[in-house]
Amino acid sequence: MDLQRFNFLIMTTQGRVATMSFMSLDHAQKVDLAKTGLFFHNNLIKCIGCRATMDRVDARRVKRHTYSDTCVSAINALVANESLRKRSFASFKWARRQFGSRAREVDMLSRRGFYCVGKRLRCAGCKVVTTCVSVDGAQRAHAADCAFRRVFDVDLDACALANVVRVDLPPPRLEPRPSAPFDAAVSECKVCFVNEKSVCFLPCRHLVVCAECSPRCKRCCVCNGKIASRLSTIPQ
């Protein structure tokens, strides 16, 4: 493969996964690596968004790259992928200790753009770094123009949800639709434009001519296919 085609290939996640076809990893691992910009070339794992290179898949270096604040590809993946941000809270010892029994807060923080890196929280949108472990504190740390600043949660408790389910909503109003007017041009013979089409050509199965014009046709008027036989139908 020439260099130009290879450069186009690694521009997409699927293309970067394709470069890892010879690596002894399962498909899910390859996709995770490719989403953060990594691809395989000349026996090295490289990144399209930064200068990171690895001669093998090193879990610690991969984790550091995945949650990097300098790699363009990794940052884009974190901005777009809430589950990737959420996964960071299980990837660092400090986060596991702080949020091990606070799954709801992890959901709320990752929804607001935050992910864990080391012993801090960082926003994928505005790049702000905070040591706050509360949702309110982290939310206040956002930059004023951060896209994640105005995220909020809709909380329906079990009682409210049950009330919504029990509501007897009226059926939707169905407006009668006027029937479409008959279009004579649709059913007329495509040869004489007078009679109604009633002969189906086989094997192409195109219904385009009337019984009078059918014998004159050696090939189908639509697909130009050779007519093997004809099937007469009842005009509509």
Curated annotation (Swiss-Prot):
Span of zinc fingers (RING-type): 189-223
Superkingdom of origin organism: Viruses
Sequence ranges of the BIR repeats: 85-150
PROSITE patterns: BIR_REPEAT_2
GO molecular function: zinc ion binding
Keywords for this protein: Apoptosis, Metal-binding, Zinc, Zinc-finger
Database matches in InterPro entries: BIR_rpt, Znf_RING/FYVE/PHD
Protein name: Probable apoptosis inhibitor 2
Protein's organism: Orgyia pseudotsugata multicapsid polyhedrosis virus
